[in-house]
Amino acid sequence: MGHIVQGSDEETYFFTQEKLEQRNIPMFYYNEENIKEGYEVILGNAFDDTHIECRRAKELGLKIYTYAQFLGKLLEETPSIAVTGAHGKTTTTTMTSNIFKHNRVTSYLIGDGTGHGEKNSDFMIAEACEYYRHFLAYHPDYAIVTNIDFDHPDYFNDEYDMFDAFQSFVNQVKNTVVICGDDRLASKLKPAHAKTITYGFNDGNDYQIKNVQTSTEYSKFDIYKNNTLLGTFTMAIFGLHDISNATSAIALADINGISVEKIQESLDLYRPAERRFSEYKFGSNVVVDDYAHHPSEIKATIDSARRKYAGKQIVAIFQPHTYTRTAKFLNEFAESLLTADKVFLCPIFASVREKEKIVGIEDLQKVTPGSEIIHGEEDFDKLNFENTVFLFMGAGNINKLCHKFFEKNTSN
């Protein structure tokens, strides 16, 4: 889009910085000297205006945006699509961007750190996060809502508070909202101005999924538009939740005049987002790195593994993310994890915002019969299985443990 970009972060490595390194975007450690005259400053969601670089920007009289404010500004500059939902945002944004970028001039920004900018885009596609109601900074032309499921208990009071946030968001959409009609709460949304299109497996949806077939390589499914076959689609995805997510992207592409043939060509080129069922194999085993950090996401990830690798043992290695979420969903986490054949738990990865340890991993172990605790690579001997899918799940830094486990088993 023509802007010169640099950024600052703490010294700890995180997987999203890899995309920045590939584009030669300068990254610095926090220092007020990083901020110069003439800069525009975007403040990440984890920080406030007391941050050392933000204070320097204010001293210089620079324009300071929150991430949501700046993204909202970008979405106003071109026809825009915002993808939101409690679960599946990143995957669905990736799917939608994949279709549109092969058929229209498209800019996009995805939660796994992936993005692309064009000066004169036909569309700007962005992942829209509900946390702290950040997405209320956006007034997109189109939106996808994958689901509404209570999360972020450190901010939202309950599912009704969360529903209210989503209702406020869809009220700001200008043209069309594509909503999962199967979802208990999302299906109740009533946009104030935009048209509503529904999708899902159930009868009555505008775009209905039927005749799902799954192999170890792909899933094949039909989509009916208003009870008439739109097309048969094939994709390298495996869970029913991902087929549902794909259907929302297909519906939005169809609404915008992209042909079924062009949609399928784009789906053939689809690759999963970072840390969304990322697979590595050794011997008879499969290692999966996945961002699942909510009970619903864990259950869906285990379901995907069973569908793709029927006959293999499923071992879940889970690192809870934040004390508040772990405490709120303690029993729900246990219930979802126990759909695996064996469960291992890692110490909780706390948020920088959390000041008090209100729950420990031992509390989750108590309600998860048969589970064991893994503290680090010194406990890898506990994972001595064959013909197994190892699911490393969590939103913290469990991906590092996952990669160390894979390296240990492939270094000889």
Predicted regions and their residues:
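Phosphate-binding loop of NTP-binding sites
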Residues: 36, 45-195, 247, 254, ...
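Short, charged/polar "capping" segments at the starts of alpha-helices
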Residues: 12-17, 35-37, 48-50, 116-117, ...
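Cofactor-binding loop segments of dinucleotide-utilizing enzymes, especially the Rossmann-like FAD-
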Residues: 10, 69, 86, 111, ...
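Beta-strand->loop->alpha-helix junctions that form or flank phosphate-binding loops
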Residues: 6-11, 28-30, 65-69, 109-110, ...
